[in-house]
Amino acid sequence: MFKKLLDNKNLVINPPVFITSILLIVALILTCVLFPEKVGVWFPAAQLAVTSNFGWFFVVTVNVILIFAIYLAFSKFGRIRLGGDDAEPEFTKASWFAMLFSTGMGIGIMFFSIAEPVSHFFNTPRPVDTDIEAAVQAMQFTSLHWGLHAWGIYAMVGLALAFFGFNRKLPMTFRSLFYPFWGERIHGWWGHIIDILSALATVFGLSTSLGLGVIQITAGLEYLYGWEISPMMQAGIILFVIGIATISVFSGLDKGVKILSNANMYIAASFMLLIFILGPTLFIMKGYVENTGAYLANFIDISTWNDTYLGSGWQNVWTIFYWAWWIAWSPFVGSFIARISKGRTVKEFVLGVLIVPGLITLLWMNVFGGSALHTILSGDVTMIAAVKADVSTALFVFLENFPFTKFLSIVAIILIFSFFITSSDSGSLVVDNITSGSNGESPVWQRVFWSFAQGIIAIVLLWGGGLDALQTAVIITGLPFAVILLVMCYSLQKGLKEELAKSSKKAKSKEEKSYKEIIAELLDEPQSK
């Protein structure tokens, strides 16, 4: 059977990566289906083991990656251009930023923009004496989770893939990041293992986001219309969205994802603007400035906090989950960012990925989270009760504080759908590239296959344990990948150093040639060819 599969001319795959990834995914799905009760015990135990014993390692990893990203931007490597000295950007900066934001955050900001700040308010990371202190701390840690560290991870993974893909002409997969160490051996089994891990991390990271999206969509439909949530309803919504994403897949990167990302930005900007205008506008403006300042002022403290002395377990549930999620999400986001960033310099790339989407994300969290906290501080504790009861309905309970509640709720659901489709479309492209090593040259149906595979995994994990199962899958796949990212940083610096030396040698050669031409002209001698 496998021989026929490999001989199929309509397939463009890297067999060891493609087949092994599918077998491991199928094994997980069968385990969840056949042993649901045991999975309900295994998943929490696995999550606790990883977060309790390796939480510190996640903290170190994300900080090292962010520091390294900032160093590269302002170092001598910052002037290196992705794709070579003559490469030009394929997308305008507006479209580039739109695709960065839609792919990098998407569904997550819809799910957590209300639930997280409110949750941190009534369950603070550190002990506080007043509600005001609780609100300040809630926004600080929300900013930590959605700010520079997340985008620093994406920036470094995207930069490494873009550099080795465009400048070294290697496959745009994670095995290529180890070329400075292994050379041509990246095409052997060690390279296959790296790509298999990145494929699994991408699939489970995507499935988590898709799962969060369908949980919130069904919660919104139940809250608005009283529809009863059932596993079949969740599965139907996932398959419906995957079907729409398939249409986008056939349109290609330049049309499908670009158009969807731009549409996402327009809808998201309009939605945020409405909340900003209809909500406590002055409070939001003042809060954005103050919260961003507090985040930066306490940056070292909160970003290196390990819950060592309190031992409350709070960090394991929140911060470590986020660091693992961003790391597991990074092969997908990084690969996609790399594909759309040809022609950018290293400095432009890093600062563009870090600053613009980061500021927009923090603005979003302040508009929504700040408004929710303002409601609570004004004496209305409905939001606290809503988050405690069901975090997935928090956004829709929040919108009841505004006029045009029904309209705003429908816009929110449309936006979640839109982010859902974008993630599925661009995610299928990335997983297909990893498992085929084709840099986008594989047949469309392979991307469609991975699109449906992500949906099925999300369905199985939801049925097997809901949000807890999704979080556990992310944390477990994020741990080995954190090690890969640290090695990636060293490998990238080595590659950039070689690139800079090569460019300097080429420039010196051109300079020497020009001197010879000038002398030849002065002596009126024919130039040697």
Curated annotation (Swiss-Prot):
InterPro entries: BCCT_transptr (IPR000060)
Transmembrane segments: 15-35, 54-74, 94-114, 146-166, 186-206, 233-253, 265-285, 317-337, 349-369, 402-422, 456-476, 477-497
Membrane topology summary: Multi-pass membrane protein
UniProt keyword terms in alphabetical order: Cell inner membrane, Cell membrane, Membrane, Transmembrane, Transmembrane helix, Transport
UniProt keyword annotation of Iron present: no
Localization (cell): Cell inner membrane
GO molecular function: transmembrane transporter activity
Broad class of where this protein is predominantly found: membrane
NCBIfam families hit by this protein: bcct
Official protein name in the record: Trimethylamine transporter
Source species: Myroides profundi
